């Protein structure tokens, strides 16, 4: 597309058409209408994260050091959530908490809400970008549909879960070690690993990795030898029009291995799309359930028997005790303002409940 220069005719001077022509023209980096949402939001989200991990402390919200300036490294630095006392405040820079003071805003955890909200809209903008480009080149929108999986997980974990709890404080902070701590929190307080939605998510992600490895290896194994090169990258012509591997050979191979095999490429690739995306959707649905404090599987009969019989123990009862230990330690550590003091009789001991 090009922009017409000179005097516009009656049909050409519409501002929308001018903007559409400029936004969607063919260039090295496509902008598009989705770019109006994607690029500013991604810029602010990444900029806020780099600023927070470099300079901003979490002393006032978590009692922690969380920046490179304080001695953290890439794995331990984080943009931390606001304090529990700030509940679900958007923590706008000009709001009643910070009152326009940038330093105070950073100390209160304003960068977390800034990064979380801009990050969510950046991800949505990226999905819209895939929709827009697919429509422009007349493709179906399955890329965008697939990307809805990561968006669902991000929104459920960083936004919906803390909205269901008492504040942003209970969302993950943006950092590697901080995410690990959040995972331990999920296990201790929600028994997340025994949640069926988590199980479906694990099956989806690991199943997708297996499918990806099998698919890649099978295609490599059945490449036509179109050249005399010994390796994959020299054994075919990158400009050839015809197919480079044999679906028939692959089908025969896996039919002999498993007794069943994919009979056509559409079903094969749809399955590779379906498995991970469904797993991510199920995980997101499970986190929404946790926001409402829905419980995972409870095997109460085993708990009662373990409490009555010191010689009876299962991996389940051991994990329940581990969860109690996590809760007893994390609650007092993470929420000192609650003055949580646990008497000895409520702390885990042996295999009794």
UniProtKB/Swiss-Prot annotation:
Organism: Glycine max (Soybean)
Swiss-Prot/TrEMBL keywords: Acetylation, Chlorophyll, Chloroplast, Chromophore, Electron transport, Iron, Magnesium, Membrane, Metal-binding, Oxidoreductase, Phosphoprotein, Photosynthesis, Photosystem II, Plastid, Thylakoid, Transmembrane, Transmembrane helix, Transport
Residues forming coiled coils: none
Superkingdom per UniProt: Eukaryota
Gene (UniProt): psbD
GO MF, one annotated term: chlorophyll binding
Annotated residues for binding of pheophytin a: 130, 143
Phosphothreonine found at: 2
BP terms from Gene Ontology: photosynthetic electron transport in photosystem II
Protein name from the UniProt record: Photosystem II D2 protein
Topological category with respect to the lipid bilayer: Multi-pass membrane protein
E.C. numbers: 1.10.3.9
Enzyme class: oxidoreductase
Keyword match Hydrolase: no
Record-linked Pfam families: Photo_RC
Stretches that traverse the bilayer: 41-61, 125-141, 153-166, 208-228, 279-295
GO cellular component annotations of the record: chloroplast thylakoid membrane; photosystem II
Catalytic activity line of the entry: 2 a plastoquinone + 4 hnu + 2 H2O = 2 a plastoquinol + O2
Xref: Gene3D superfamilies: Photosystem II protein D1-like
Ligand binding (chlorophyll a ChlzD2): 118
Function per UniProt: Photosystem II (PSII) is a light-driven water:plastoquinone oxidoreductase that uses light energy to abstract electrons from H(2)O, generating O(2) and a proton gradient subsequently used for ATP formation. It consists of a core antenna complex that captures photons, and an electron transfer chain that converts photonic excitation into a charge separation. The D1/D2 (PsbA/PsbD) reaction center heterodimer binds P680, the primary electron donor of PSII as well as several subsequent electron acceptors. D2 is needed for assembly of a stable PSII complex.
Residues involved in a plastoquinone binding: 215, 262
């Amino acid at each position: 597309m090009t922009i017409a220069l000179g005097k516009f005719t009656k049909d050409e001077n519409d501002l929308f058409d001018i903007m559409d022509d400029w936004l969607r023209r063919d260039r090295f980096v496509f902008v598009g209408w989705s770019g109006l949402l994607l690029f500013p939001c991604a810029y602010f989200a990444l900029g806020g994260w780099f600023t927070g991990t470099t300079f901003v402390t979490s002393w006032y919200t978590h009692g922690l050091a969380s920046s490179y300036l304080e001695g953290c490294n890439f794995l331990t630095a984080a943009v931390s959530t606001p304090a529990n006392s700030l509940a679900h405040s958007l923590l706008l820079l000009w709001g009643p908490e910070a009152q326009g003071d940038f330093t105070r805003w950073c100390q209160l955890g304003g960068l977390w809400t800034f990064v979380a909200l801009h990050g969510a809209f950046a991800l949505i903008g990226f999905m819209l970008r895939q929709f827009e480009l697919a429509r422009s080149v007349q493709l179906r929108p399955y890329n965008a549909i697939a990307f809805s999986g990561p968006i669902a997980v991000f929104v459920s974990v960083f936004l919906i879960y803390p909205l269901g709890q008492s504040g942003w404080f209970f969302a993950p902070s943006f950092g590697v070690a901080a995410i690990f701590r959040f995972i331990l929190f999920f296990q201790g307080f929600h028994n997340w690993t025994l949640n069926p939605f988590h199980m479906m998510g694990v099956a989806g992600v690991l199943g997708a990795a297996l499918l990806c490895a099998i698919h890649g290896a099978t295609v490599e194994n059945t490449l036509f030898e179109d050249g005399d090169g010994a390796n994959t990258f020299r054994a075919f012509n990158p400009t050839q029009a015809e197919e480079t591997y044999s679906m028939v050979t692959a089908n025969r191979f896996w039919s002999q291995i498993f007794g069943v095999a994919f009979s056509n490429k559409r079903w094969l690739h749809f399955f590779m799309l379906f498995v991970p995306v469904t797993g991510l959707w199920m995980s997101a649905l499970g986190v929404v359930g946790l926001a409402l404090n829905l419980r995972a599987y409870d095997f109460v009969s085993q708990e009662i028997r373990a409490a009555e019989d010191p010689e009876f123990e299962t991996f389940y009862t051991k994990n329940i005790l581990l969860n109690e230990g996590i809760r007893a330690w994390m609650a007092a550590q993470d929420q000192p303002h609650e003055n949580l003091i646990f008497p000895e009789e409520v702390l885990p001991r042996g295999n009794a409940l």
